[in-house]
């Protein structure tokens, strides 16, 4: 199966490196804040990420996660994200609005790209393909909908390699001609803050990343730890 060129580039350019000297801190000083399409992997991860960027950007969360192959789990995570968005907007209604859009739930496309890698360990080649598929679609939608920037909440997880995410983001920036927001959300205690905010908003926190393979691996680990 032919893969998107960015997916191929991400895999083949493991040593691709590029620096970013852009300063985003003055964005809020401009008359109109730049727009950001923020790929949201789930509600809990989105909390601290939204808090981090919402003062400087017009934020729209993009829920595109075909890796969540269990439909009930997918719907639960979407509803959890909307639970947070609605509560956060209500709290800050006089300051800003965080928007939400949902991507296509194309599970079969995700399975076609990852089936041969189902035995890969967490963080391996299967995850690389998964990152690439989701962030590529985010960049594509950001270009189509004329956003100024795109990025993802995935970097808030301590289990996600930001160098890989950034490399992919910069490749996609070149390919789509739209700016990748270079930000590692796990820094400045981002993950701890996401846990704190999830408790504050009473959000469901899942015990695995998303795909069935990761779920089985987590279940096996829990069984071995008993």
Regions found by a protein language model. Give the residues of each.
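Nucleotide-activated chemistry modules centered on ATP-dependent adenylation/adenylyltransferase
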Residues: 2-51, 56-226
């Amino acid at each position: 199966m032919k893969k998107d060129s960015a997916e191929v580039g991400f895999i083949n350019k493991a040593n691709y490196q590029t620096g970013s000297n852009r300063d985003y801190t003055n964005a809020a000083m401009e008359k109109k804040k730049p727009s950001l399409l923020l790929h949201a992997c789930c509600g809990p991860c989105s909390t601290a990420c939204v808090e981090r960027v919402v003062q400087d950007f017009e934020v729209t969360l993009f829920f595109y996660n075909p890796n969540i192959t269990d439909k009930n789990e997918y719907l639960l995570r979407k509803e959890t994200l909307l639970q947070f968005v609605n509560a956060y907007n209500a709290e800050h209604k006089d300051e800003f609005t965080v928007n939400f859009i949902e991507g296509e739930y194309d599970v079969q496309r995700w399975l076609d790209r990852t089936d041969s890698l189902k035995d890969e360990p967490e963080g391996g080649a299967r995850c690389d393909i998964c990152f690439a598929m989701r962030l590529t679609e985010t960049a594509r939608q950001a270009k189509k909908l004329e956003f100024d920037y795109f990025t993802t909440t995935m970097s808030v997880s301590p289990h996600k390699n930001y160098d890989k995410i950034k490399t992919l983001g910069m490749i996609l920036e070149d390919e789509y001609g739209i700016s990748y927001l270079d930000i590692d959300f796990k820094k400045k205690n981002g993950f701890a803050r996401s846990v704190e905010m999830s408790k504050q908003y009473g959000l469901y926190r899942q015990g695995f990343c998303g795909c069935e393979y990761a779920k089985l691996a987590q279940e096996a680990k829990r069984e071995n730890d008993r």
